[in-house]
């Protein structure tokens, strides 16, 4: 086979978005080595432009038919395009939030960008991984870069502690997940492509075997750790509290998107004849995540820990769409994931901005902030209320679509739990807003008293202010434009043969 024929057979055009991010990563390293600090002022815009270019190329591939790439190792279907877009969008917003934070910490901005882009590459590859080798390599790429990002503030003891905890728990969860995949590798007779593994296991009559059950349990546990679902969530609040806030912002959405993409592809492909079983397992995970995440969040005094437990509950909400297992379920998961990016990153952006001025993330220290910076309080309130699902904000319509799809699929108890815990979440979100808008001067915290008001000007927007504006606009406008977003999500599911085959199989098993 000639070289050009080999390149053509690999269908590398499907990996062009990842290629752009890789070239961007190397380019940033070369610029830093060549110019050092002389280009620090405009270094921020290089990854932003590169990531936006990658997003444009990615969107142009949406709805394509020839999706397999790299000899079947990568699946560039519309489902993977959606999740890869989410990861790129998360990275763009996090870069906007990080510049001032990293500069204040007197650490290298280039190192932060390189580690973040490496995590982006790992997450994007994981979203389309189609065989065991690609799953392992992309999982470790995402994991290792995330551990390094968590410990990025080398002189901060809390950051170091968070990195060690994340490393140990992440390594354990990866081992558990890989052990489950290795069982399937053995049952299939040595196949590595996930569709071939499923076919071989069914042909050999091992789809209901004890080993398949064990593999399902191990894979479920591994995925539960990756998306911070209860009861495998213990690492999340500690890591969220100790890590640099821009890193936490990315982990809360980017890693969750990659984990959900992996869960959707593995569960619908590898366990088509254990659908009822994995549905039951994930119903338990979703219920525990929504209940424990929201109940424990009530008692938190740290803003980052509160959002950490909130992230656990959000994983439970997202699982409702996965469990529904029909086009509306999958599309509701995609819609809510997109909305969650804006809501959650908007909240973290406000925490970063306040922390830069006040140097604290304790909820009580936000007391009276409305008197000093009413616009920041407004943006923070919009993000929190949207996370709580208050109409007419985007979070309300996202949860409504999720609950409707779950109800239509017959998961009534799960929907009731989601509704009940959403009310609980509104309570602790409103508690934060109440603290910020106290009007009595004597109730104002000492940190707010020292707080210097930021001048918000459209003509002189700082990157973090632009990031906050985009997130708040997303949280508001996405509620107005929710119908077009739902239509795009439904088309994404329609263009993904994997999800269509899964639905047909579920109907066959039901009847």
Curated annotation (Swiss-Prot):
Gene that this polypeptide is encoded by: ndhB
Acetylation listed as a keyword: no
Name of the featured protein: NAD(P)H-quinone oxidoreductase subunit 2, chloroplastic
InterPro entries named among the record's database cross-references: NADH-Q_OxRdtase_suN/2, ND/Mrp_TM, Ndh2_N
Alphabetized Pfam families for the sequence: Ndh2_N, Proton_antipo_M
A molecular function (GO) term: NADH dehydrogenase (ubiquinone) activity
Gene Ontology CC terms: chloroplast thylakoid membrane
Membrane-protein topology: Multi-pass membrane protein
Complexes and interactors: NDH is composed of at least 16 different subunits, 5 of which are encoded in the nucleus.
Protein family membership: Belongs to the complex I subunit 2 family.
Task performed by this protein: NDH shuttles electrons from NAD(P)H:plastoquinone, via FMN and iron-sulfur (Fe-S) centers, to quinones in the photosynthetic chain and possibly in a chloroplast respiratory chain. The immediate electron acceptor for the enzyme in this species is believed to be plastoquinone. Couples the redox reaction to proton translocation, and thus conserves the redox energy in a proton gradient.
Keyword Glycosyltransferase: no
Domain of life from the UniProt record: Eukaryota
Broad enzyme group: translocase
The EC number(s) this enzyme carries: 7.1.1.-
GO BP field: ATP synthesis coupled electron transport; photosynthesis, light reaction
Membrane-spanning segments: 15-35, 39-59, 78-98, 108-128, 132-152, 167-187, 210-230, 244-264, 278-298, 306-326, 334-354, 377-397, 410-430, 466-486
Subcellular location per the Swiss-Prot or TrEMBL entry: Plastid, Chloroplast thylakoid membrane
Major location (coarse): plastid
Catalyzed reactions: a plastoquinone + NADH + (n+1) H(+)(in) = a plastoquinol + NAD(+) + n H(+)(out); a plastoquinone + NADPH + (n+1) H(+)(in) = a plastoquinol + NADP(+) + n H(+)(out)
Alphabetical UniProt keywords: Chloroplast, Membrane, NAD, NADP, Plastid, Plastoquinone, Quinone, Thylakoid, Translocase, Transmembrane, Transmembrane helix, Transport
Disulfide bonds: none
């Amino acid at each position: 086979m000639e070289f050009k024929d080999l390149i053509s057979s690999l269908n590398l055009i499907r990996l062009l978005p990842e290629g752009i991010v890789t070239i961007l990563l190397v380019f940033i390293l070369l610029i830093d080595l060549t110019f050092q600090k002389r280009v620090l002022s405009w270094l921020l815009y290089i990854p932003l432009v590169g990531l936006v270019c990658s997003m444009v190329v990615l969107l142009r591939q949406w709805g394509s038919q020839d999706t397999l790439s790299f000899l079947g190792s990568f699946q560039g279907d519309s489902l993977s395009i959606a999740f890869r877009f989410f990861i790129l969008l998360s990275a763009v917003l996090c870069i906007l939030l990080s510049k001032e934070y990293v500069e204040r910490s007197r650490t290298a901005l280039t190192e932060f960008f390189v580690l973040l882009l490496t995590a982006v590459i790992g997450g994007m590859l994981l979203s389309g991984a189609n065989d065991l080798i690609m799953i392992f390599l992309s999982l470790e790429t995402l994991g290792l870069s995330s551990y390094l990002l968590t410990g990025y503030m080398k002189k901060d003891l809390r950051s170091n502690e968070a990195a060690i905890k994340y490393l140990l728990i992440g390594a354990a969860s990866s081992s558990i997940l890989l052990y489950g995949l290795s069982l399937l590798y053995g049952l299939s007779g040595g196949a590595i492509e996930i569709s071939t593994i499923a076919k071989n296991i069914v042909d050999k009559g091992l789809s209901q075997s004890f080993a398949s059950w064990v593999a399902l349990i191990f894979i479920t546990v591994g995925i539960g750790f990756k998306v911070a679902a209860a009861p495998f969530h213990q690492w999340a609040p500690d890591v969220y509290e100790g890590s640099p806030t821009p890193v936490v912002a990315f982990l809360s959405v980017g890693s969750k998107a990659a984990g959900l993409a992996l869960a959707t592809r593995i569960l619908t492909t590898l366990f088509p004849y254990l659908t009822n079983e994995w549905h039951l397992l994930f119903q338990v995970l979703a219920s525990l995540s929504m209940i424990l995440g929201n109940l424990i969040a009530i008692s938190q005094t740290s803003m980052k820990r509160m959002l950490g437990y909130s992230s656990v509950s959000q994983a439970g909400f997202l699982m409702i769409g996965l469990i529904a297992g029909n086009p509306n379920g999958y599309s509701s998961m995609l819609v809510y994931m997109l909305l969650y990016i804006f809501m959650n990153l908007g909240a973290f952006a406000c925490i970063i901005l306040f922390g830069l001025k006040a140097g604290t993330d304790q909820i009580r220290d936000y007391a009276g902030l409305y008197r000093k910076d009413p616009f920041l309080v407004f943006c923070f309130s919009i993000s929190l209320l949207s996370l709580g699902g208050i109409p007419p904000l985007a979070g309300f319509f996202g949860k409504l679509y999720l609950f409707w799809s779950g109800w239509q699929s017959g998961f009534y108890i799960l929907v009731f739990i989601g509704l009940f815990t959403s009310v609980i979440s509104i309570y602790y979100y409103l508690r934060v807003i109440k603290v910020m808008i106290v009007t009595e001067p004597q109730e104002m915290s000492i940190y707010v008293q020292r707080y210097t008001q930021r001048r918000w000007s459209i003509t002189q927007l700082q990157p973090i202010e632009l990031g906050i504006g985009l997130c708040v606009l997303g949280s508001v406008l996405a509620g107005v434009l929710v119908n077009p977003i739902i239509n795009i999500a439904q088309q994404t599911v329609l263009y993904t043969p994997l999800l269509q085959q899964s639905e047909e199989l579920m109907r066959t098993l039901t009847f």
